[in-house]
């Protein structure tokens, strides 16, 4: 016990009782990171060269686009962190300590080494320590060990080096008192606690780039090299044709600006940003922007059991009474034996429900919750039949007894382990009568108990004994008992878990359960929700302890359930799947999940029950702690990736058309079809709006019928490049057709005007072609994107304004078109739609 002064000194010496956070990046650092993209670097170089050579307009436009993109990325990153911070709260906001001989409440962060802390049912343990006094203390350490059932604590010494879950004379930060009360002396705080040690493991787990980051980096380098080659060819052709070196270089740079989709980075960021906002509304907060797509790419989900796949709440499954097993949903309170078993289970019970908060051992709260579901108020039952005396539960005899006055007689109610109670039975309740218990009765009870246990159920036996008079119960009274029945219970799966697992399997994702709980219990849950088919797919962590990394890589495909695992096991399992070429997601809520969350490609933490360490390690936080939210996130991720691909296809096919048109004009010794201002107009207006709209395409549930993309698969696949080439060729042909029509009389300005109008209009129309890889012109899906329709209408108005308004004609170096010429421009642009839709139909038929 400390004095206040000693507590202050120790607080200075050992530091505050909190976990250290990694060094936070400043907003300016986050802003600078937005400029690391290879495409952005190329554009900056182009802008500098353009400005140096006099094309200040192009340089300004490029810098504005890049800066806007960087600001948007910074805002989204900061917003995501702020959303997560709103979830954060201290593991134990306050703690009761004894200082200067007085009990006082202090912030958990001020608890220090040497403090005497008082805890009781409902309290969180604020720091690690050794027990001083104990009164039937049980502690839920599931967040630390993965064990779903509370651990009974005592003052008995334990062997040095005992496993964490076996240190029954100590309590650990972040644990939860479910029953009893105790006092303990604090021995470790902050990063020195067991929670802190696990947090330290995170430093050894490297962070991974998401698939989108890898693909876009690869894509940007290949695209830039290709475009620079094209620009070099154009520069050489221009010089050979007699153009001055300066003019040839300026146009090559202008073409580079037009060909490199500088809007790409900002469009990808905008699409991901909208994706994160949509997912936040669906209870998923994204901490790392590109994780939106990354989650949709996973092929393995390693999930914790307790609180993630299950409810983290014990519920009654079955009654065994009068020789029959009855499901909890079929309990009939008109049956005297069933009603008596329910009543006795609420009387021989210390748990309570205070303002909706369950206080007590989970197995006991499950019993009073069942009573509530059946219309029986435990408080009224206890008031009607008050407890006269008791023999509290202890782990040695594994029994609890209470005495009550019921219907004119004194009754002792006993509950406990089946094997212990059977030894003390002399009679059995058989319908309305009592009779002596037979060996056959005992065998039936043992068989039923074994059946329940093999299905992962926790079993309690109940018995009673009529007393001659009120007396203080003693241990000697717990004999000559009458067997009443068994009650089985378990931490059941979440309602949504089975469907969520089935959806994952349909999508080609293998769900794996990794837990610190017992193998039988874990396997029972896994079978219920579809993760496990037979017991050969389940193993305990000890099995992989001595395996080499290579042996583990060969072993993991055969296992769907891992039980009794340590944090180090989890990291090894995740890494083994990654070494096999899989993209791995790890879901969980406990401190023990955090290292694997960090090691995984995508870490998914629980927002309500999740520990602070787990949230900090994760890429995504589920605010509803619902496993089914992950399935929606997978669908969102896949759709967002597809939408980004559609936007890229739209941008590159249009850019390819412009390149083909310019190259054709150069090779055919024709005038240059576009002025630099034309290309800037196309990039900023007729490209960006439809591309963003394509990124916001309504989600297509069909993506969940596809298998995950192969790890390392580039965006620039052969079919993707072929589509870009063919579609770009079609648009290029229409553009140069318009150019040649306008150039019949040798009017280069008219030819350039018609080519510019056709290219702009064609790209607007082409947005509808890029909605899907198959023809959709005659389906509802063709019209389901209001953003794309809006971009098309706005783009048409802008083009028409440039072509028809005299003040804009001079600025954009175009001339007035006749009605016939205008119809020719729009007609050629619209022709792209049926032509490309027909090509998609032919390609689909071939598949």
Model-derived features: positions:
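Membrane-water interface at loop-to-transmembrane-helix junctions
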Residues: 710-729, 749-753
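Generic alpha-helical transmembrane segments
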Residues: 686, 731, 753-767
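Conserved cytosolic headpiece of P-type ATPases
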Residues: 1-705, 715-716, 729, 740, ...
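A C-terminal functional module that forms or caps the active site or interfaces directly
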Residues: 770
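C-terminal catalytic subdomain
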Residues: 734
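Membrane-helix interface and helix-disruption motif detector
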Residues: 744-748
């Amino acid at each position: 016990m400390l004095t206040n002064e000693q507590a202050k000194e120790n607080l200075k010496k050992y530091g505050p009782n909190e976990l250290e956070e990694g060094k936070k990046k400043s907003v300016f650092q986050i802003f600078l990171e937005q400029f690391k993209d290879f495409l952005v670097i190329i554009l900056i170089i182009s802008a500098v060269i353009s400005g140096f050579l006099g094309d200040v307009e192009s340089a300004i436009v490029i810098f504005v686009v890049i800066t806007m993109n960087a600001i948007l990325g910074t805002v989204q990153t900061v917003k995501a962190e702020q959303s997560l911070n709103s979830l954060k709260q201290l593991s134990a906001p306050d703690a009761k300590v004894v200082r200067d001989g007085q009990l006082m409440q202090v912030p958990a962060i001020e608890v220090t080494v040497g403090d005497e802390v008082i805890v009781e049912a409902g309290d969180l343990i604020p720091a690690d320590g050794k027990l001083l006094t104990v009164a039937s203390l049980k502690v839920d350490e599931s967040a630390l060990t993965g064990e779903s059932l509370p651990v009974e604590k005592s003052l008995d010494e334990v062997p040095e080096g005992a496993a964490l879950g076996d240190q029954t004379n100590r309590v650990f930060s972040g644990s939860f008192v479910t029953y009893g009360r105790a006092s303990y002396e604090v021995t470790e705080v902050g990063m020195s606690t067991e929670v802190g040690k696990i947090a330290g493991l995170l430093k050894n787990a490297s962070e991974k780039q998401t698939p989108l980051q890898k693909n876009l980096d690869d894509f940007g380098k290949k695209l830039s090299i290709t475009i620079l080659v094209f620009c070099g060819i154009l520069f050489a052709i221009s010089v050979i044709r007699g153009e001055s070196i300066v003019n040839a270089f300026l146009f090559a740079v202008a073409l580079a600006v037009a060909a490199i989709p500088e809007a790409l980075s900002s469009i990808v960021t905008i699409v991901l940003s909208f994706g994160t906002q949509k997912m936040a509304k669906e209870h998923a907060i994204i901490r790392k922007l590109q994780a939106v797509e990354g989650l949709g790419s996973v092929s393995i989900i390693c999930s914790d059991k307790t609180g993630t796949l299950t409810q983290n709440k014990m519920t009654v499954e079955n009654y065994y009474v009068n020789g029959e097993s009855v499901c909890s949903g079929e309990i009939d309170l008109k049956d005297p034996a069933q009603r008596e078993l329910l009543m006795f289970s609420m009387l021989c019970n210390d748990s309570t429900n205070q303002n909706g908060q369950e206080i007590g051992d989970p197995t006991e709260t499950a019993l009073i919750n069942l009573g509530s579901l059946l219309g029986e108020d435990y408080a009224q039952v206890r008031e009607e039949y008050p407890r006269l005396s008791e023999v509290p539960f202890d782990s040695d005899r594994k029994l609890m007894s209470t005495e009550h006055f019921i219907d004119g007689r004194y009754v002792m109610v006993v509950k406990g382990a089946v094997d212990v109670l059977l030894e003390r039975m002399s009679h059995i309740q058989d319908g309305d009568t009592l009779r002596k218990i037979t060996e056959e009765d005992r065998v039936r009870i043992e068989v039923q108990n074994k059946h329940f246990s093999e299905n992962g159920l926790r079993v309690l036996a109940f018995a009673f004994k009529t007393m001659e008079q009120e007396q203080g119960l003693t241990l000697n009274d717990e004999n000559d008992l009458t067997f009443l029945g068994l009650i089985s219970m378990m931490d059941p799966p979440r309602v949504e878990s089975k469907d969520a697992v089935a959806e994952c399997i349909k999508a080609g994702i293998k769900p794996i359960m990794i837990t610190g709980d017992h193998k039988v219990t874990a396997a029972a849950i896994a079978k219920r929700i579809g993760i496990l088919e037979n017991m050969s797919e389940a193993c305990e962590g000890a099995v992989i302890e001595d395996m080499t990394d290579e042996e583990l890589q060969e072993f993991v495909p055969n296992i769907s359930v891992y039980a009794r695992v340590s944090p180090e096991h989890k990291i090894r399992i995740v890494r083994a799947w990654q070494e096999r070429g899989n993209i791995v997601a790890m879901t969980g809520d406990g401190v023990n999940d955090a290292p694997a969350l960090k090691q995984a490609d995508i870490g998914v933490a629980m927002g309500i029950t999740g520990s602070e360490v787990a949230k900090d390690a994760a890429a995504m936080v589920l605010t509803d702690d619902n496993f089914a939210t992950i399935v929606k996130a997978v669908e969102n991720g896949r759709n967002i990736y597809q939408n980004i691909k559609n936007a890229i296809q739209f941008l590159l096919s249009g850019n390819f058309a412009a390149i083909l048109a310019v190259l054709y004009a150069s090779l055919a010794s024709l005038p240059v079809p576009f002025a630099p201002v034309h290309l800037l107009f196309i990039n900023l207006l007729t490209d960006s709006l439809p591309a963003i709209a394509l990124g916001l395409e309504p989600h297509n549930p069909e993506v969940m019928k596809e298998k995950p993309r192969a790890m390392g698969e580039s965006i620039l696949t052969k079919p993707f490049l072929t589509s870009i080439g063919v579609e770009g060729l079609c648009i290029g042909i229409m553009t140069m057709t318009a150019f040649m029509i306008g150039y019949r009389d040798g009017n280069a300005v008219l030819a350039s005007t018609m080519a510019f109008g056709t290219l702009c209009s064609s790209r607007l129309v082409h947005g509808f072609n890029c909605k899907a890889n198959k023809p959709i012109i005659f389906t509802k899906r063709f019209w389901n994107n209001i953003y794309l329709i809006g971009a098309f209408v706005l783009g048409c108005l802008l083009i028409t304004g440039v072509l028809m308004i005299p003040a804009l004609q001079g600025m954009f170096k175009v001339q007035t078109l006749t009605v016939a010429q205008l119809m020719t421009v729009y007609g050629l642009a619209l022709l792209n739609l049926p032509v490309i839709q027909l090509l998609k139909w032919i390609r689909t038929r071939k598949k």
